[in-house]
Amino acid sequence: MKRGFARPTPEKAPVIKPENIVLPTPLSIPPPEGKPWWLIVVGVVVVGLLGGMVAMVFASGSHVFGGVGSIFPIFMMVGIMMMMFRSVGAGGQQQMSRPKLDAMRAQFMLMLDMLRETAQESADSMDSNYRWFHPAPSTLAAAVGSPRMWERKPDGKDLNFGVVRVGVGMTRPEVTWGEPQNMPTDIELEPVTGKALQEFGRYQSVVYNLPKMISLLVEPWYALVGEREQALGLMRAIICQLTFSHGPDHVQFIVVSSDLAEWEWVKWLPHFGDSRRYDAAGNARMVYSSVREFAAEQGELFAGRGSFTPRHASSSAQTPTPHTVIICDVDDPQWEYVISAEGVDGVTFFDLTGSPMWTNVPERKLEFDKTGVIEALPRDRDTWMVIDDNAWFFALTDHVSIAEAEEFGQKLAQWRLAEAYEEIGQRVAHIGARDILAYYGIDDPGNIDFDYLWGSRTDSMGRSRLRAPFGNRSDNGELLFLDMKSLDEGGDGPHGVMSGTTGSGKSTLVRTVIESLMLGHPPEELQFVLADLKGGSAVKPFAGVPHVSRIITDLEEDQALMERFLDALWGEIARRKAICDSAGVDDAKEYNSVRGRMRARGQDMAPLPMLVVVIDEFYEWFRIMPTAVDVLDSIGRQGRAYWIHLMMASQTIESRAEKLMENMGYRLVLKARTAGAAQAAGVPNAVNLPAQAGLGYFRKSLEDIIRFQAEFLWRDYFQPGITVDGEEAPVLVHSIDYIRPQLFTNSFTPLEVTVGGPEIDKVVAHANGEVVEEVEAEAEEEGIRVPKVGTVIIDQLRRINFEPYRLWQPPLTQPVAIDDLVNRFLGHPWQKEYGSARNLVFPIGVIDRPFKHDQPPWTVDTSGPGSNVLILGAGGSGKTTALQTLISSAALTHTPDQVQFYCLAYSSTALTTVSKLPHVGEVAGPTDPYGVRRTVAELLALVRERKRSFLEYGIASMEMFRRRKFGGEAGPVPNDGFGDVYLVIDNYRALAEENEVLIEQVNLIINQGPSFGVHVVVTADRESELRPPVRSGFGSRVELRLAAVEDAKLVRSRFAKDVPVKPGRGMVAVNYVRLDSDPQAGLHTLVARPAMGSTPTNVFECDSVVAAVSRLTTSQAPPVRRLPASFGVDQVRQLAARDTRQGVGVGGIAWAISELDLQPVYLNFAENSHLMVTGRRECGRTTTLATIMSEIGRLYAPGATSVPAPPPGQPSAQVWLIDPRRQLLTALGSNYVERFAYNLDGVQAMMGELAAVLAGREPPPGLSAEELLSRSWWSGPEIFLIVDDIQQLPPGFDSPLHKAAPWVNRAADVGLHVIVTRSFGGWSSAGSDPMLRALHQANAPLLVMDADPDEGFIRGKMKGGPLPRGRGLLMAEDTGVFVQVALTEVRK
């Protein structure tokens, strides 16, 4: 039997250690210097003087130098000579002593020894590296079957692909030599160290006895020139080298020789087999006796091929495979018709004939002598380029004998590329219990006793755990098992992959494995999570089975779902780890062992079943989300200890899954579409499988690869022993074809006919005694009339009452109904104990926590620091729906007495759907500006009233208020008719742009309201749309899909970008402890649907909520009080009589009611003595003056000079009236009206008189402070200058009113009150009138009635606008309030 070989991951080769060696500098000895000239002169002079002295001594007859004394002249002469010839000065100091020179030589030699060791280490690393990739041919036979076999890869990264050793020779080392510094000259060079350095460089510049290689990808052919035996020995060595290191799928060989006996040994090598032709001995051997025969059989090899392209000139890094090596051992001129001078692309020739056709190209010639010395043109080691035109010594040739080659070939013949499973007979007879159902003892799939089935499997912690049959071996028909346990438990897992192209039966195999595991394990022990990147045809049939925790499909549609799925798996690992930690154990196996013992004692523990995660089409996942490879790899590594098993399936596997494949145990590989996919799956031969569904390879390890036929459980179901026609089924008996033994030679051996057993039809799948001849590749439609075995089993499994742990919640695609959400939040139906909630927490949606496997309610807590709520989101993000949901949620959890809502709908009309809720007091929008103003005014008045009443009743906080009013705590509470009140503003910016005055009031409520139970809920596109003073006033925050992620505060902006563009989707921060997560990472949220669950899923109106709540409560939120369209002066007076307020002018002229509190508005002379009124025609300006004059008559005594003075202490009034239209003549009698004018002359005259009167009231100089405060310098009535339609008087310096204008700012000193009306047209130019200008300077209140907003700002940032008759905006310095003027009849 042949053995399969699957290429393992290449082992790590020894690394070449490049070195950088700087040569040391040899010793330097400078030449000696000459004697100074003066020394010679001095010496000659001294010698001469000494000689003269001696001569004189002898001439004088003295005996000083006689006897012993004669020695002194001799010493003097010797001393002078030594002084002259010794080294002196600098020249003498440069001479080196011999001991010192020897020491320095020894030091230099030691340095060379150290460098020699460094260079030798680099050379040794080169030797190890070269011999790793190119071992001696004599060692190859022993290495056959080792992981080193067939390791070359044509991927462009393996630079040794196509490179083959031919001998050993010399190579320059991987050493960079640095020149010595300060190299001495030849004269100064110390000879010993210089010679040593020269010899060191000579011997260390070459590495000896290293493999020498040639490349198949550099030249189109090589000519081996020399003695024939030498050439044949080298060729045999080359063949052995290439067939060992290159697989038969990468390199194939062809021999064309006239001496076929010489090449008989190559029949053993799979590389010589023709993959297209077969004979009785297998693949036909590509050995031919002539060029003609070769061309006839392999002519198509050259069809369409271009010229040979060297590797360094190719545009592609990858090498096309298989590369063909043709050995030319026949001298035939017909070769010229086969190959040109440029060669053939993808083909390398080796010529052994020495024909000139092959040898006339020097760079393609390897010439060797009898001693085996090869000479060739030298090439660059890295680029393979020829660097010299003269042949050099290249190598000592390798040589392999025929005996050695045949031994090598016979050993290699045992191996096929992942074909250990191939036998002569492939058809299998299924006899007895060789199928899944028989293994489990199931006679009738439609009637399974699961209690008995699972009860009989008592070794759930033993060998049978996660061990299930899935098909049959192709060689002997035995039942084949998949054991998903870890390798250390004797299994094939814990994780594995399954691959197969379309039509290979992958989906069927996935179903078979899953259902077989279900049959072997009860749901308490085994759970599945079935995920499919696409439609889920393979896993959808298992819906509702108690083993299945969740079926997840269509993951490829949204990458966020993929990340969510991975998060859920991480959460399951964390959950299981926590369970194990709580029991004090390390892994799931130990935990279940402890649990089993505890249950035997009657004490149960939390279950921890095995979890098989099936991911179909995972390759698509990696394509869409490349980081998933690393994540799944980590999940696989950490999950194995907690019984989490991954089973990955895909149509193809590519290199990007390489890291994940390292952690995969078993591999079920069906037919692959490409060689690359088969290679990546670990079974390269899968590409050669026939197109037969369910046929594949089961790879347990590198050497244990089994060919199998998967069982088809989705076959038609019939009762046992009955065919489709209702007849008794026949028993099928099969035999195996027999082929006679054949003599194995290089020659073609024709197939003989079979001699044993009957012919049988091709069997694709066998199951339970039935023969299934055709099987669909993917999931097929369920039969209408005939049920399937698999579905029959699944239907029975669905009847089991078991609820699995759900580790996957539905994605946030459909919003939950509001009543379902509230029920989930309360833990009981919302109608039960309705209104018993004592907090102000409202659920508005769900939070998706895939890591925790749940979706808790998303709540807004408005009872504490989060009293005000800000809802941020871009346009279309669902802000208005969030408001509807919040209000509906409050309505289902609180009574209308507890919470009330007042809404300003500036975004859309959707909020009007909550208007009928008993909790809602008002819904107003831009089409009802008055309703908007009244709503704000009402709540602002409530804040002010509660400020007062809380002090009065001793209420310290809203918590105390709620306890007293709704919790039964003793103590008084204000009877204002409100509980917690919510001002809801949909689109804060729109309101701010429309009404500057109103938005300031809203801001006041935002800052002050929460302390008194008045909350504000606003929506905005951007946080910057809020006014700066109130941006920090929102303690609760709802972030939907943001218009600008910079506004994100709950999560980091990089997470906020992931919120999908879907209404209602948002994000909150992680609200649980997760050590591996950013605390500001986001959790996705979805706002609930503001409708009851009984309504269709596309209904977002609140009518159903209104109906449901109205059935439980009869209370109603107080409506917003509105100013009446008409309000009489008597009614104002009645209100004024009951008014107890302070500081608002109570007791004065009451002329209107305020919309803030529906209380009277007074002319508060303590603050300002004047009033201006403007508005368009028929707005009620004159009526305003009539009402004020009526009040003057009510409050003041007549003050005209024609009547007697009133009693002391009673104030009196004197009216100076300018009425061009004469409508106010009857408002007051002549006893009040001092002067009256209706034309210019009369006005001028009257103003002169008034000026004289006022001048007389000027305070004289020298008054004391007491006199000034008491205004004792004048007496008399208060003077009211009332001017109607001042626009009819000349403006500017021609205005007759300029005479009285100087006293406007000193009105309090002279008792003057100016009340003026003017039409609104041209108000921007009203400053030219001296009286109006003076009133502006005095900050007189301005009542703007019906006006044109296009006039722009009138005072501050306040504008006018259309108003009903009698209504106006009373503007003070920087505030404004709408008032309704009391109606007084005016003479027409």
Curated annotation (Swiss-Prot):
Intracellular or extracellular location(s): Cell inner membrane
UniProt binding sites for ATP: 500-507, 873-880, 1175-1182
UniProt entry keywords in alphabetical sequence: ATP-binding, Cell inner membrane, Cell membrane, Membrane, Nucleotide-binding, Repeat, Transmembrane, Transmembrane helix, Transport
Domain FtsK stretches: 477-679, 855-1049, 1158-1351
Pfam families: FtsK_SpoIIIE (PF01580)
Superkingdom field: Bacteria
Function: Part of the ESX-5 specialized secretion system, which is responsible for the secretion of EsxN and a number of PE_PGRS and PPE proteins. This component is essential for ESX-5 complex stability and secretion.
Protein name in the entry: ESX-5 secretion system protein EccC5
